[in-house]
């Protein structure tokens, strides 16, 4: 009982598709490396322009210190310098600056960085949320430069907290920023309000600028970068941009726009829709800059008017890319979690509606996440075992028919079309499908790929240890190499080695039972592919390589059990003999195939006849 040619083709196709998937997943990193020089040059140009603009703006906007009416650009404030006030709940702590009345450093209480520090977002001088307003005496200023006065933090019985920042000029024009943070939530509600909006703003909409810097959070910065995207919901459809491709994206009718790192999001959301949004970003020259990416996102926000009063209702999400957490906000943020992309986008439905509920159920009853992965993999392999059984059963039938196929091959060795037709007749009379070994293997691809994306994207694996792996969301490192080996790296992942070894064992066992080893491609490809995995898997999260090890081990055990103890050769031969006694009923598809083969045979015979006459 061995693996027939079609079964091997199926597994080779799986390997090819898997390699294609790794290619697409590394697309952002390849693009990033290809654009480094261009990005570095563009950053220098942008910085020079920015410095010139800042210098001009500073001179133009510099108030006359001798004239109190020009202090704070003509807006009232009880403070002469920036101060900080905080809102917090059990999940998040947000610091607000009265300069600009805007959010500053965000601390996620339940998460740590790779070096044990609290995860901080929106931290640093680069981060700001601002817009331009008209000030007295026909001047203008960025609201991020204006000092606001804030009221005391309001705490409600439901656990929510809110704060209002206000400023006004001598004529009564007033600006207020209200922020509300609910209990047990990462979403920050925000409302910008204007009294006398037509005088404060030069346009009918609010032109908002959001600058955000994504810091290093994970240990493997290079892999973290490949998982960093600019995501948006435009006209009701989610899409994203690799940060290594281009540096800007223009959008219309956009619900939200945000930056996703490997496991964390920073997102600005409109209660209505942004009329326009322009996303732009650039990458650091090297790791010494201590950030992954900087973004400059601009928005055209519609005003909700009531007479001369206008509001801009917004929300900001700073938190984990947890599918369940994001989904509860009902604005489509859960699409950020990459449960399936590119040619494998369809597997996201398997992950969302099957694997995630199963995973949640198991992890609530099992403490160790490595055991959770083992149990899920075992469950999936048992569910797909009938497919595996059909594949090996088809191989066993092919092996029984092999002597007759070899006889036909010898008889029609000079006429491949005739051989193909007779082989089809033989298979049909015996009740054997030529695709019986290939299709079951291909049908396993969606399951395999859904598990791949699921374990790669699930934040619940982050920081969880198992055996020698300290973090299942990062590669396991049992030894460091003082230099980098091409296509491998500078470290040794033991789970990768176990995955490769189990893959080789499957190949060795399968090839030992294969009835036809004459084709060099069929003979060596199953051995080459596992070795290629050594370089591909070495920097992948330990959860993936552990899953692959478990999956291979279970597959090998099932393969031995099915072939040694379940498949009965005598029954197969008896079934084939019984099928031959039955009248052969051809399907329409088979009739068309045989008709085409017959036509091709007649055409070839005619060509041969004319050739002989010549």
Predicted region positions:
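A general marker of short, structured functional hotspots
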Residues: 19, 28, 66-71, 92, ...
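Short extracytoplasmic
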Residues: 44-69
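Soluble non-transmembrane domains of integral membrane proteins
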Residues: 77-337
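N-terminal, polar/Ser/Thr-rich
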Residues: 33-34, 38-42, 66-78
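Helix-loop-helix
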Residues: 1-51, 96, 190-195, 209-224, ...
